[in-house]
C-alpha cells in the first residue's frame, strides 16, 4: 500500500461498508458507494491519489465501467489530463475495439474508442476495486493495442486473497491501493 497518512487511510477504510451474503451466500461485499456518501472520505481518496500521481507525466486516465469513472474522472480533472471510459459493449458511440475476459461463469467484454489513446499516451488505469484482476487485464490489453503505455493502476479497495494483485503485477503494472481487506 502507499505510504500515506494512517488517519486518512483509516477514514477511507472505515467508510466502506461490508454487506454479508451479497450478491450471494458466503460473499462479503465491500460497498464503495458508502464511501461516496461520505464527502470527507471521498475527497480524501481523490486527494491521496492526486498527491501520489501529480507530476508523474501521465497524459490520460482510463476508468473502467462504472465505478472506475467515479474515481478516475475527478483524478483526471485534478491532474489536468484527459479521462477515457472503458465500457461494456454497445455503450460507446464512436468506433471501438473490444477485449473479452473470463468471469467466474462465462465471459464478458469491454470496449474503448479507437481514437481515445495514442502511441504518445502514458496511461494510468483507475478502478474502485481489485479482486481477480480480469477487468483490468482486459483494459490494459485494450490500451496497449492502441499503442498506449500503461504501467500503473490505482484502486480504492484491494482484495489480495482473490489473486488480482499477482495477476496485474505479472503484466508489469505498479499497483496503488488505498485499503485492503485480507481474508475478511
UniProtKB/Swiss-Prot annotation:
Gene3D superfamilies for this protein: 3.40.50.2020
InterPro entries from the UniProt entry: Ade_phspho_trans, PRibTrfase_dom, PRTase-like, UPRTase/APRTase
Keyword field contains Cell wall biogenesis/degradation: no
Single GO molecular function: AMP binding
Entry EC no(s): 2.4.2.7
SUPFAM superfamilies: PRTase-like
The protein's annotated pathway: Purine metabolism; AMP biosynthesis via salvage pathway; AMP from adenine: step 1/1
Similarity remark: Belongs to the purine/pyrimidine phosphoribosyltransferase family.
Function comment: Catalyzes a salvage reaction resulting in the formation of AMP, that is energically less costly than de novo synthesis.
The name this protein goes by in its record: Adenine phosphoribosyltransferase
Organism name: Shewanella sp. (strain W3-18-1)
Chain's gene name: apt
